[in-house]
Amino acid sequence: MDLSPRNRPLLDSSSLDSGSLTSLDSSVFCSEGEGEPLALGDCLTVNVGGSRFVLSQQALSCFPHTRLGKLAVVVASYRRLGALAAAPSPLELCDDANPVDNEYFFDRSSQAFRYVLHYYRTGRLHVMEQLCALSFLQEIQYWGIDELSIDSCCRDRYFRRKELSETLDFKKDTDDQESQHESEQDFSQGPCPTVRQKLWDILEKPGSSTAARIFGVISIIFVAVSIVNMALMSAELSWLNLQLLEILEYVCISWFTGEFILRFLCVKDRCHFLRKVPNIIDLLAILPFYITLLVESLSGSHTTQELENVGRLVQVLRLLRALRMLKLGRHSTGLRSLGMTITQCYEEVGLLLLFLSVGISIFSTIEYFAEQSIPDTTFTSVPCAWWWATTSMTTVGYGDIRPDTTTGKIVAFMCILSGILVLALPIAIINDRFSACYFTLKLKEAAVRQREALKKLTKNIATDSYISVNLRDIYARSIMEMLRLKGRERASTRSSGGDDFWF
């Protein structure tokens, strides 16, 4: 499309509302200057996305670091010196120009430009409510306005949304790379490609078939039984059959081992497989059992002292069996969202620990010196006071160490109050991040189910077999599920004070 001035349709003042910001008869800058209106030659017309704005060059020159400020300087230089001016060409700052009518064209959003226009009028930049933070950032960067110029009333909302958008974009890119890597699993190389493909779908895609769903349920049952069995083995009750519990432990470990080996044999890139967090958790869940068997089998010919050391090692290894609980993360969106939230909020968590450490150090020292002179006091040292300050600031309050003096109780009250305030600071950020991660995973699961259904439909069409999948139903279900998730996300944000507070 030719955008040259001779072929571009120009809007005259009759086609615009005389009271609007885009009217040529009522310029926002060509008003009164020193008692008289500015001449038309002192103004320039800016056409942004088809909307025309008449701006004062003098007012634009007050913002020389912006694109329009630079354009005003260039236009003024060309008027004085003509083509011999040392300034750059106006076409370096705009998409097209009509020097005859002094009109300059920009292929940008006219809606976003109204906020830029308000910045030139008042020196205050406000954020669009209808536009995402990253898109608004692109617009103001194009016009040469720094995001630090955003007014204080919109600054918190803008940076909060920008951080959330950047986090979700980074997570989306990571998930896309993971999905691409998984989709590129080449099962054609190696033995039994069809069997490996079907087995991989059963192991890694619980919603792909009835067999996959049954396998997922059985896996969850084995995890739950293993955890309960581990707890019963430590109870040492007289009515429990320890031999039966040991047999049950062997059965659960055999299931976990077979599940891990099948996953390992199905994949092509086994180094990448071993680096993934879910597979590391699976490996840590079964290794302590085999290491314990190995240690116990090799401890027969050792001395008593060595046997005691081996016993301690075995006890530590048995504690690692609690990691089996993390295997539920394969089947729980909430657990995966919790892991993502902790990973993404490490700065907030670190800041929380720093605040707690400072408070514990201060209040424990004060409390120790306030209580040390009391007979039979429980504050025997500063480390003991650390334990008291920790339980008090986290509002646990075991009661094993407590103050007896009035001064100590006042300090305890201040410690508890400061703990409540410190713990409440990052909760809103972590809650928003958890909600965003949860609904992102839900949308991803919906997209995966839709993709699997489309693959099944494509395969049926290619083999001329009976088509049991309706494409329209797949699309309708996916859209309805996404709308439902988006509605829940908005309701969650509103209930946590998100949009209602910021808007």
Swiss-Prot record:
The chain crosses the membrane at residues 214-234, 242-262, 280-300, 313-334, 349-369, 410-430. Pfam families: BTB_2, Ion_trans. GO terms for biological process: action potential; potassium ion transmembrane transport; protein homooligomerization. Residues 3-213, 263-279, 335-348, 431-503 are cytoplasmic. Residues 235-241, 301-312 are extracellular. Keywords: Cell membrane, Ion channel, Ion transport, Membrane, Potassium, Potassium channel, Potassium transport, Transmembrane, Transmembrane helix, Transport, Voltage-gated channel. Coiled coil: none annotated. The keyword Metal-binding does not apply. Detected in brain, in neocortex, olfactory tubercle, hippocampus, dentate gyrus, piriform cortex and amygdala. Detected in Purkinje cells and granular cells of the cerebellum, in hippocampal CA4 neurons and neocortex pyramidal cells. Residues 171-184 have a biased composition (Basic and acidic residues). The keyword tRNA processing does not apply. It comes from the Eukaryota. GO terms for molecular function: potassium channel activity; potassium channel regulator activity; voltage-gated potassium channel activity. Residues 1-20, 171-192 are annotated as: Disordered. Residues 10-20 have a biased composition (Low complexity). InterPro entries: BTB/POZ_dom, Ion_trans_dom, K_chnl_volt-dep_Kv, K_chnl_volt-dep_Kv8.1, SKP1/BTB/POZ_sf, T1-type_BTB, VG_K_chnl, Volt_channel_dom_sf. It is found in: Cell membrane. It is a multi-pass membrane protein. A motif (Selectivity filter) lies at residues 395-400. GO terms for cellular component: membrane; voltage-gated potassium channel complex. Heteromultimer with KCNB1 and KCNB2. Interacts with KCNC4 and KCND1. The segment S4 is probably the voltage-sensor and is characterized by a series of positively charged amino acids at every third position. Belongs to the potassium channel family. V (TC 1.A.1.2) subfamily. Kv8.1/KCNV1 sub-subfamily. Potassium channel subunit that does not form functional channels by itself. Modulates KCNB1 and KCNB2 channel activity by shifting the threshold for inactivation to more negative values and by slowing the rate of inactivation. Can down-regulate the channel activity of KCNB1, KCNB2, KCNC4 and KCND1, possibly by trapping them in intracellular membranes. This is Potassium voltage-gated channel subfamily V member 1. It comes from Rattus norvegicus (Rat).
